UniProtKB/Swiss-Prot annotation:
EC code: 2.3.1.74
Identification of the protein by name: Chalcone synthase A
One MF annotation (Gene Ontology) recorded for this entry: naringenin-chalcone synthase activity
Reaction catalysis annotation: (E)-4-coumaroyl-CoA + 3 malonyl-CoA + 3 H(+) = 2',4,4',6'-tetrahydroxychalcone + 3 CO2 + 4 CoA
Keyword terms of this UniProt record: Acyltransferase, Flavonoid biosynthesis, Transferase
């Protein structure tokens, strides 16, 4: 005889699963140092002692001109590069140098964004119950989450989660993760911090690796933080966005198109030219699966927080999805002003969206 087990939710447990997580505050930060994209090719080839590679320099200039990026903020300065010449070659062993810088700077930049989010939230820092930290810049133990806990003075009992090496996927992954944490832990207030610094991928040019030039043109440094929770307290907390649902999809046979590998020379970047087309050809299937349950099929009727992996990606997705120019405006603006900020990019765009909404009210 097969036993029968009946499970009944108590009133308290049932209430825990009611309602959606809300985004309660956002903060962003960038290094004070920034580079002008129009003149960056001259700086890059000079600082890497590669000015003799005239054709390669002109190729890099064309890539920068087509990027639609106006400027990027970088921790790397000319002084820092002169002090560490092994960062300026293509393949010299330099992982220790990069790690020494990143382990210190990533949590510091994350703190700046976190403090802004906490200030906007307006509640005591002691009410933060969970901390999630994400970066693709360096690896260390104790991790950047532990270092940030000390920098902010969080409770020693805060529940921490450290996520390394998520790349550009991290922004959406953080939203998915924080939704689960906020909705399944009564009274939770989750601080999420994404901090990225490109020292791990900066290197001199290589005649054999053109995708390295794309990496040197595309990525910028920045951090973003958000505070999430369920059941905002009236008069004390102001919800900005509601996290209704989340999903993730793997497109088969695409794992070779975009790869990053940690080596003695740092983090190497390899990107296929097919990436914009692959994304554009598959985005609609993802949209249908996500929005069909809600009866939505007009992609111009929703607001887009689209990670701008690069200008070509934004163009192809906009064209293939039949979007009007305003749908991806916030993504284009963030790309123009900061470059690709990897994990922090989505939160920068959310911040841009809410600022625009306030202006339009």
């Amino acid at each position: 005889m097969t036993p029968t087990v009946t499970v009944q939710l108590t009133d308290d447990t049932a209430k825990r699963f009611e309602g959606h997580a809300k985004l309660l505050a956002i903060g962003t930060a960038t290094p004070t140092n920034w580079v002008d994209q129009a003149t960056y090719p001259d700086f890059y080839f000079r600082i890497t002692n590669s000015e003799h590679l005239l054709e390669h320099k002109e190729k890099f200039r064309r890539i920068c001109n087509k990027s639609k990026i106006r400027k990027r903020h970088l921790v790397l300065t000319e002084e820092l590069l002169k002090e560490n010449p092994n960062l300026c070659t293509y393949n010299d062993a330099s992982l220790n140098t990069r790690q020494d810088i990143l382990v210190s700077e990533v949590p510091k930049l994350g703190k700046e964004a976190a403090m802004k989010a906490i200030k906007e939230w307006g509640r005591p820092i002691s009410e933060i119950t969970h901390l999630v930290f994400c970066t693709t810049s360096g690896v260390d133990m104790p991790g950047a989450d532990f270092q940030l806990t000390k920098l902010l003075g969080l409770n020693s009992s805060v529940k921490r989660l450290m996520m390394y090496q998520q790349g550009c996927n991290a922004g959406a992954a953080m939203l998915r993760l924080v939704k689960g944490l906020a909705e399944n832990n009564k009274g939770a207030r989750v601080l999420v911090v994404c901090s990225g610094i490109t020292i791990n991928i900066f290197r001199g040019p290589s005649l054999e690796q053109d995708d390295n030039l794309l990496a040197q043109c595309l990525f910028g440094d920045g951090s973003a933080a958000m505070i999430d929770g369920k059941d905002p307290r009236p008069g004390l907390e102001t919800p900005l966005f509601e996290l209704v649902s989340s999903a993730q999809t793997i497109v088969p046979n695409t794992d070779s198109h975009l790869k990053l590998h940690l080596r003695e020379m740092g983090l190497t970047f390899h990107c296929s030219r097919a990436v914009p087309s692959v994304l554009a050809e598959n985005v609609e299937d993802c949209l249908v699966k996500a929005f069909e349950p809600y009866g939505i099929s007009d992609w111009n009727s929703i607001f887009w927080v689209f990670h701008p992996g690069g200008n070509a990606i934004v163009d192809r997705v906009e064209e293939r999805s039949g979007l009007g120019p305003e749908r991806l405006r916030a993504s284009r603006d963030v790309l123009s002003e900061y470059g690709n900020l990897t994990s922090a990019c989505v939160l920068f765009i959310l911040d841009e969206m809410r600022k625009k909404s306030k202006k339009d009210e």
